[in-house]
Amino acid sequence: MIVFYLSGDRVFSTDQNAINGLYNKRHFGKLVEGKLFLSLLEATYLVERGKIEVREGKRKLTVEELMNLGRERDELFDAKYLVYKDLRDRGYTVKSGLKFGSHFRVYRRGMDEHSQWLVWVLPENSRLSPNDITARVRVAHGVRKNMIMAIVDEDADVTYYKVEWVRF
């Protein structure tokens, strides 16, 4: 079992098996100075699947404890996790979309050089202004990506909507 250690709002490992298997082959995390860092979303997903364990000191953390840590830091953590999990389970590579004003960048199966989609996660009861939608679609269009809205309902089902410019 590959061991990761909690460090703030992410986890890390220096295990070469983690770096080779999770980063190089399956495109999880970010490699910084010989350490593989995973977000809490990635760590929760991998712990839930029995691929890694996360420790805080010597204590092993459960999936629920990781979920609670995520919830403390992000009120949308549950919705984001459902979308992250759904996309990963479908075989897509999912990375942070922060620098593009979205929650995720999503790559086709495998890992192309450029992501195909930007995904914005919203609970179904969210209120959206036309300006919010326009701004996000404009950014996606400007970086040649498709904008996807992932709506999570109260039954934890995810529905995806592609939002794009239409020219007449």
Curated annotation (Swiss-Prot):
The keyword tRNA processing applies. The active site is at Y107, H114, K145. It comes from the Archaea. One of its GO terms (molecular function) is lyase activity. Keywords: Lyase, tRNA processing. It is an enzyme of class 4 (lyase). InterPro entries: tRNA_endonuc-like_dom_sf, tRNA_intron_Endo_cat-like_sf, tRNA_intron_Endonuc_cat-like, tRNA_intron_Endonuc_N, tRNA_intron_Endonuc_N_sf, tRNA_splic, tRNA_splic_arch_short. The keyword Acetylation does not apply. GO terms for biological process: tRNA splicing, via endonucleolytic cleavage and ligation. Gene3D superfamilies: 3.40.1350.10, tRNA intron endonuclease, N-terminal domain. One of its GO terms (cellular component) is cytoplasm. Its EC number is 4.6.1.16. It catalyses: pretRNA = a 3'-half-tRNA molecule with a 5'-OH end + a 5'-half-tRNA molecule with a 2',3'-cyclic phosphate end + an intron with a 2',3'-cyclic phosphate and a 5'-hydroxyl terminus. Endonuclease that removes tRNA introns. Cleaves pre-tRNA at the 5'- and 3'-splice sites to release the intron. The products are an intron and two tRNA half-molecules bearing 2',3' cyclic phosphate and 5'-OH termini. Recognizes a pseudosymmetric substrate in which 2 bulged loops of 3 bases are separated by a stem of 4 bp. Homotetramer; although the tetramer contains four active sites, only two participate in the cleavage. Therefore, it should be considered as a dimer of dimers. HAMAP family: EndA_short (MF_01833). Belongs to the tRNA-intron endonuclease family. Archaeal short subfamily. PANTHER family: TRNA-SPLICING ENDONUCLEASE SUBUNIT SEN2. This is tRNA-splicing endonuclease. It comes from Thermococcus gammatolerans (strain DSM 15229 / JCM 11827 / EJ3).
